[in-house]
Amino acid sequence: MDYIKQAESTQLSSLSLSRLEGNNAEESKRLLEACAQDGFFYLDLRDHKQLLVDYEALLEIIKQYFNEPLDQKMKDDRKSDTIGYEPVATSAGVLDGLPDYYESFKVSWNQLRDHVQELPTVVETNIEVFDRFAKYVHSILLMILSRLSQTMGRNNDNRFESYHRDSIATRTNLTFLKYPKQDTTEHGVGHNKHTDVGTLTFLLSGQRGLQRLTPEGWCHVEPRSGFAVVNVGDSLRFLSDCVLSSVIHRVLPVGAHQTEDRYTLAYFLRPEDDAVFKDINGNLVSARSWHDRKFDHFRASHNQQKNDTILMGGMEENQKFLQYKFQA
């Protein structure tokens, strides 16, 4: 297993959601620096009590859901990357030759926004809290894009939020992940290294396991009560002409194997499907095609993954992290 540096919670910037909502110029500057230099930052939610209450409520709901028998959960399997249930061991994992070891449940933003009638029962039964939480986090991430656009001097159709029009189809979704307790890693482990496909990711978890890759090696990203972890995805990196950093990360047990059930809530903001940008090779691609190619690559074997840069978004070469320096 790779050498992992000690916790780096003090090394990542902590930004105030309240100050960003208030359009504080200094906080917006710090936001840009964090997204360009680290690609990750902590977002202080402690002034937003309802958001934290809703997170705790959703966590309890999803724990009960994941504890249901597999055959019951498989009724929500839609064979989709944005909707429904997916069992463990469907993609390549952290260890060579072994699959991942997490299960997930996804709720599409398109479904919630459009109030479709075919939502999974667990969502339909608790629609108020799912709807309120997703809409608030969605608005927070659009606000963050607006602050980045403003600070970088981007105008009109060139603003980042203009690629996220509300009425257009998108791969955006709310995802819940469970890394089940294990006695061994022989059946799979963790979540393989990757960059996120979309614009911004909003993570909440009270348990350790998330690591990001730096030029010095793998570093823990410590959970902090009352804070979300936000990170830049490939689409935002490409839309920013690679000024902003989509950083490689993974999830691993803290010890030799997963000693307790680990839960994560993730909101993945992604551009509208037809948004177009240049990828790492300079090719024009749509957000939908980049998303679909990347998720197909997640399911490929480790040997197949080594023949393409898409899983790491072009941020790794010969097992080394590529760092793009930000000049203020």
Curated annotation (Swiss-Prot):
Cofactor note (record): Binds 1 Fe(2+) ion per subunit.
Origin: domain of life: Eukaryota
Summary of the protein's practical applications: Pneumocandin B0 is the starting molecule for the first semisynthetic echinocandin antifungal drug, caspofungin acetate. Pneumocandin B0 is a minor fermentation product, and its industrial production was achieved by a combination of extensive mutation and medium optimization. Inactivation of three of gloP/GLP450-1, gloO/GLP450-2, and gloM/GLOXY1 generates 13 different pneumocandin analogs that lack one, two, three, or four hydroxyl groups on 4R,5R-dihydroxy-ornithine and 3S,4S-dihydroxy-homotyrosine of the parent hexapeptide.
Cofactors: Fe(2+)
GO molecular function annotations of the record: dioxygenase activity; metal ion binding
EC number annotated for this UniProt entry: 1.14.-.-
Positions contributing to Fe cation binding: 194, 196, 249
Pathway: Mycotoxin biosynthesis
Residues that hold 2-oxoglutarate according to the record: 262
Protein name: 2-oxoglutarate-dependent dioxygenase gloE
InterPro entries: DIOX_N (IPR026992), IPNS-like_FE2OG_OXY (IPR044861), IPNS-like_sf (IPR027443), Iron_ascorbate_oxido_reductase (IPR050231), Oxoglu/Fe-dep_dioxygenase_dom (IPR005123)
